[in-house]
Amino acid sequence: MIRLSKRSVSTLLRSGNQSFRIAAAASTSRSSPSATDVKRSDTESRWYSSLTNGQSKNSGSFAQLNMKTNWFMGYRNESSAAASDSSSQAPPPAEKFEYQAEVSRLMDLIVNSLYSNKEVFLRELISNASDALDKLRYLSVTNPELSKDAPDLDIRIYADKENGIITLTDSGIGMTRQELVDCLGTIAQSGTAKFMKALKDSKDAGGDNNLIGQFGVGFYSAFLVADRVIVSTKSPKSDKQYVWEGEANSSSFTIQEDTDPQSLIPRGTRITLHLKQEAKNFADPERIQKLVKNYSQFVSFPIYTWQEKGYTKEVEVEDDPTETKKDDQDDQTEKKKKTKKVVERYWDWELTNETQPIWLRNPKEVTTAEYNEFYRKAFNEYLDPLASSHFTTEGEVEFRSILYVPPVSPSGKDDIVNQKTKNIRLYVKRVFISDDFDGELFPRYLSFVKGVVDSHDLPLNVSREILQESRIVRIMKKRLVRKAFDMILGISLSENREDYEKFWDNFGKHLKLGCIEDRENHKRIAPLLRFFSSQSENDMISLDEYVENMKPEQKAIYFIASDSITSAKNAPFLEKMLEKGLEVLYLVEPIDEVAVQSLKAYKEKDFVDISKEDLDLGDKNEEKEAAVKKEFGQTCDWIKKRLGDKVASVQISNRLSSSPCVLVSGKFGWSANMERLMKAQSTGDTISLDYMKGRRVFEINPDHSIIKNINAAYNSNPNDEDAMRAIDLMYDAALVSSGFTPDNPAELGGKIYEMMDVALSGKWSSPEVQPQQQQMAHSHDAETFEAEVVEPVEVDGKK
């Protein structure tokens, strides 16, 4: 006998129990288990019920293991036998049911819930007609007899405005009676999808095709505008023509053979739409033409619409019988007949679409004039674009595209957050899908880029109106963005500098928004940025030009943000930098500061705001700093005590040369410019404003005479009231000159007037008059004088 440890027995029990469950499941899955199987399952069930629940009285008597069947064998546990007999019956077999649908309700959902725009019915029907023509063209390669009855492959649309009827006819492959039942009688069954699958399975299938359909619901979009649809079709595979007829609110349709000689067609399909009362405006020939040009302009086959035309001709004008004849007229002179021009009207078929899109041509064969003409026509523009890019991408995603940079911003220079634009027209197999995107193909900061994108395989929803989010779309977006940047970079590198100046004037703010929102493309955006600087106040420079002009010892790119170039160049922060010849960028647009801070660095050079603390100009002299700190250190503490919580600290400045003091922002706080902007946009939340502006550093210039006098005042009489007032006024002056807004402008004005009074006292007045004026001023405060009336006296003393 083999002895097993407790752990081994436990493992074997679990293994056996699992095997039993598998076996039991297999036995119950059979529809009619045999009696032997039921008996064996019953026995095994009782054994493992006893083993796993610890109910066996003879726990030591079943140590045998049958290795062949992986079952424990031993004594039968009689106490559980009765219970297992009652539960050994196999469950009854499950019945299988098919889903049922209320067809009329389902049709209503498909028609009215899938499509958001009724206009797409024509796009869907034209796409189906194009697929029918494509099928015929493919099959005719191996069987030329299919196309002998009607050699012309085209689509014709007739609009009867008076009766509200639209008829669309194609000379495609047509349908047999059975195909009518399968394709039009079965919802969501796509004959085109089946055909494409057959092409892929065929050894003779070509690599590329223009077949459009895939969902099998496009035909039913006809019920968006029609309450009755009649389909007459003739397949070259059959000698008979059949008519399919259905109504919008019906759950059934009819099919019958068409025996009317006048309605027979050589081959193809004719769809007749009897429009609803509210949709009869679609039967206007001009509107049909407009819809074709919008949605199906580049379908592979010619589309003709029935249009009214006219030509001008001259006709004779009959003489007026009331006109008197001239008696003296020479009878021999031949009279000249009077004519007038009239327009002769007639109806005829007119080609409405262009079958060869420009983006399918080789870019080397397309001229600039053709690109510009397509841009003006496609986007209804009258100016030529600044640049264009025609490209094809292959690999995981294959698509063709032409992108344009418009010459001006259509929505205004300041509108940079308009997410939804109609600047990108998406086509799938030449059929227009949509131009209403919300960042799917381009980020909003590049929403000004216009163009067309055509792909053969994109994840669309069933209505083919919405581009679904997927990895393919993300890859496409990334490649489109890169091509757009390449196109803009080409403008910036052009010899014609005015082109990029025009671009920057219209779309510079868009790129700055990209610095904030698109960190992934910082390296592409940064070379395109332009700013004014301390060495270029009239012409903007690029960051590359700034880096080239940097001093050898310069380690950072310096900038200052302000509301104008004038205020930026006169700020006290620039004094020492201008002396050293260090260039400073002027950020004068509200978005500039945030954009540059988002970049953080360019070509391993950090951006440094010169209006913030801890400015390092690379000229530290520790011995000199120690001497100055020793001399003015206590004065700084004295000034800090006077200013209190207004400043975080008072320090010796290394950025001043002509100003006595300056107020700088904390390293992680808002600058004066940012604080001004945030106050303008504040909606009453002052807590965050106070928090971000809380840390300010008051820097003093030890070489300035005012600071030297303040230092002397501290050393002689630190409690002098005039010195205290001077510190307060010095702080307020620094507040204004540094770009901050004083909390109490009136109080600041009072301090200035007071100091002016002290400074101007005795400046122009005589010493004798001054005490008298002061005495009169004091007496005026004590009492009120009555006015003395003085009579006028002439020069000679007479009244």
Swiss-Prot record:
Coiled coil: none annotated. Residues 46-61, 766-777 have a biased composition (Polar residues). Residues 1-48 form a transit peptide. Residues 23-61, 314-337, 766-799 are annotated as: Disordered. Its main location: mitochondrion. It is found in: Mitochondrion. Residues 23-35 have a biased composition (Low complexity). ATP binds at E124, N128, D170, M175, S190, G191, Q214, F215, G216, V217, G218, F219, T269, R464. This is Heat shock protein 90-6, mitochondrial.
